Amino acid sequence: MYGYEDKTYNEVLTQAVNNIEEINQAVDAICEKGYKNLYLVGTGGTYAMASPLSYLIKTNSTIPWYYEIAAELVTAKPKQLTKDSVVITASLSGTTVETINAAKYAKEVGATVIVLVGEKECPLTEYADYVFENRTASNDNLVEEIYIQYFALGARFMKNNGEFPE
């Protein structure tokens, strides 16, 4: 693989795994408060990266969910996106305009917003209730980092929904 470095790759995966306890705490707090549905929102690559989580929820859960392109979410203004919704999105740079606009719109309707970013100090986090940062991530290893954290989020929502009996 071009540009592959064991050390960097391991750092990225370790940081993503290290975020899981904080992810679990955030999801537990959201579930305790109550929510109606999940929105998986992205732009370009981060939209594509949410596809496996979308499939996991579709095939293994009764949680109501939506899988949306960020710009379309803002344009369509779905009626199901409310103060009782949870929006999950990601942007390595935190400067993707469409993703920022989607998070801003979600906050305007009162939704809870979870974001995954490379750096906490970025425009996207202005509209986030929960921020999970991975400073070691880059475009070369973003997929693995996002997958780990997306699956941690999805699994915890599903666990709290009673879908993992053990």
Regions found by a protein language model. Give the residues of each.
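Active-site phosphate/pyrophosphate-binding segments
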Residues: 2-36, 138-142, 153-166
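Glycine-rich phosphate-binding loops that contact phosphosugars or nucleotide phosphates
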Residues: 36-165
